[in-house]
Amino acid sequence: GRPVTPRSGDIVEFNTLWYNALMYVSELLAENEGASELSSRLAGIAEKTAKSFVDTFLNEYGYLLDYVDGDMLDWSVRPNMIFAASFDYSPLDAKQKKGSVDFATRELLTPKGVRSVCPKSGGYNPNYVGPQLQRDYAYHQGTAWPWLEGFYLEAYLRLYKRSAISFVERQMIGYEDEMSLHCLGAIPELFDGNPPFKGRGAVSFAMNVAQILRTLNLLEKYDNQ
């Protein structure tokens, strides 16, 4: 078969996860006196990974490329770059994180989640309707995903701290009505990427519910700081 959304080579969120894992294990080992040498080695690898990450993915417009495969650069603005600004360990500095978050705010954010691709990108298809094949081609090409917004809002809170609380709270309001429209107390799988942002797919999606609960916990944490 053919992939609906082909992505090959160096993929931005895979490399973000790799850096995060290297740093996490390095700090974990640093607490063990007998593993300090391995901890230092992993920290060194992470440092090289961070430099390579920035050289590979950060473009002159201030956001991250989705993937790089040899000479093929995918300039699509996708939410996959947000993980690099939301994880505990990031290969980006504060200015670089802000660039990705600002792009996501302008191009991807909706009242019902984060779009899977920017409307200005080729192949944008915001409506999850029609037969299976048609819906498959819309799945990651413009529909909005609440679970991805959880990572976006976490990145926003990391950047702006307490000053971000009111913004995050306003984003959460968009889900209140949805909890009584489809499955009581739950959020549907995804939403159309354009107004009126109609809920689609499964009537209850655990990843979305979990991210909303996690975001509410993050709000409480920052509110108490």
Which positions does each model-derived feature cover?
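C-terminal substrate/ligand-recognition segments
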Residues: 119-164, 213-217
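Catalytic cores of carbohydrate-active enzymes
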Residues: 7, 17-121, 125-127, 170, ...
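Terminal, non-catalytic domain-edge segments
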Residues: 206-225
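Feature representing long, continuous alpha-helical segments
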Residues: 98, 102, 146-154, 166, ...
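Catalytic-loop motifs flanking and including active-site residues across diverse enzymes
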Residues: 14-17, 80-81, 144, 148-152, ...
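Long alpha-helical scaffolds in large eukaryotic adaptor/regulatory proteins
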Residues: 25, 29-36, 156-159, 163, ...
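Active-site lining segments of carbohydrate-active enzymes
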Residues: 1-9
